[in-house]
Curated annotation (Swiss-Prot):
Gene giving rise to this polypeptide: kup2
One Pfam family it belongs to: K_trans_C
Chief localisation class: membrane
Protein origin, superkingdom: Bacteria
One GO cellular component term noted in the UniProt record for this chain: plasma membrane
Lineage: Bacteria, Pseudomonadati, Pseudomonadota, Gammaproteobacteria, Legionellales
Parts of the chain that traverse the membrane: 14-34, 51-71, 97-117, 133-153, 163-183, 211-231, 245-265, 283-303, 335-355, 364-384, 393-413, 416-436
Protein name per its UniProtKB record: Probable potassium transport system protein Kup 2
Amino acid sequence: MNESLTEKRNELSLSFAALGVVFGDIGTSPLYAFGQVIKYFPINDYNIYGILSLIFWSLIIIVSIKYLVIVFRADNDGEGGIIALAGVIRQKIKKPGGWLLFITLVGIGLIIGDGMLTPAISILSAVEGLESLSPNLAKYVLPVTLIILFFLFKMQSIGTGKIGVYFAPVMLVWFITIGILGFLQIIQNPKVLMAINPYYAINFFMIHQYSALFILGGVFLVMTGGEALFADLGHFGKKAIRTGWFAVALPALLLCYFGQGAFVLMHTEDIKYPFFSLSPDWFLPVMIILATLATIIASQAIISAAFSILKQASLLNLIPRLKIVFTSKFEKGEVYLPLINFILALGTCSLVVIFKSSSNLADAYGIAVNLDMLITTVLVGIIAYRCWSWHAFKILIFLLILIIELAFFAGNIPKLLTGGWIPVLIAFLGFVVMYTWHCGFEKLRELHHRDALMDAFIIDELNQNKISRQPGMGLYIIDPYDYEGESLLHHLRLNRIFFENMVFVSIKIENKPYIPIEDKFELIKKAEGFYLIFIHYGFTENINLPNELDEMFKRVYLPFDIIKNKLIYFIEIVFVEMTGERQKHMYLWQKHFFSLMIRNAVPDIQFYQLPYNNTIAIGTYYQF
């Protein structure tokens, strides 16, 4: 009984904490989404009922059913997100082909675009409440927004730290407040609740026909942030997120949207900001402050999610290695990526300056999230067919969801002409970077495979004791493109310097988020006094090689003593020289770009957190 009570308390505690992280983006959508939708058609009962019906069933079908019921089943050992889904498919399909890489890279690129747009539109829409307070304050909206964004990105380097504990209480107050404000309007015009009937959504399309598609781009804004429910699965778990959604977030959002619908039907004059119109004049300053705090929290969650997924991509070698700063001693997942933070800050502030209002930004917003949701639907559909063995009849569920999301995509297509091309361009540029990096590494792997054939004789000579050795031990760190240390063996062959004991360490990032300690180490004896050790990591884990080696030496038997402070680490630094010829899968500009990226990538000594005084770097030149 006590254990059950404790478990329920822990679940409620996690659900409460999830309010401050998971639901921030989707929870602040009422600030701009409804106002964006109603500008397309005249305000009358049938139009508002149709719009509210579309909003209601979008949140039910896409967010509640698709994500919380179906997609949640496709977790990768409790982890969610694009990379986790790709990992599940790779576990089942050993050689999935280039299509999975393509989808994964596009998905990551879209997340970068979302990381710029979400803080811009969220915070700008909150600060625009100043105009509702007084039209004279309109001139301060942009400067205040830019100041908030500056400090938001500035504080990333120190982490959220202690202030993070206040995120959930603020968001709970936010949801309660918007729910109450909406409810107060509904009781004055309860007829809006008829919009729950899907007849009004269908009737809306029958009346407006093809022109109704344009409104879907606006309706889709109510779901932006829905993908975060799955992406943050690893932090809070399924039960906590489902409880937080169905008990707090969803009811509050529906009350707020229906409340805005009730209000505009009672006040049919031109309403620029229907959300802030819900608030009484005496409460408006408090509402603006609360909205600003909520959007800052929502933006923080998106920025942290971008850091997290790009850290995973860096470990999986999908992007160049990035400098990773751990901002908390207690939360291992709390990281800061300086370069990414700068790119996001520059992009976000530029968007605010260019578009100037949340209404203009809304024209650019949504298409990236829409594409991300489509990718998720396709990947989970493949998992359902290949991993869950769903029959064709069940797979029709995904076909239905795909048709709905494609309809939303059709509604978002006109946004390409009014700013929607920006997130698509960001995603494309991200894809070019990642694909060029992938092609360059494939070329390096090809070159190392040739070296492996050349250096096989060294192992034979070591086995036959034909090579003289000097006392001591060398610990050689193998790069991802070098499966068994062929480049370092090549160096040894040229240098003729062989330690009495040599250990080659290869880091392998698996398609799972975490690797149990008992499965982490793999020892292979290559020759007398020459060992190859594989250390397996999950794609969400933090790499600290010296600490991992300490644990390894306790668990893996080696027939010689290890003196930690006398360990010498050998790493490779790669230099790429251009040949001027186009090679397979790489244009000349790609080779130059890859050379630039590999020169500026974080070196092994930093990435693996090796001791500077005990590390020797070996330079290797490759011709492309």
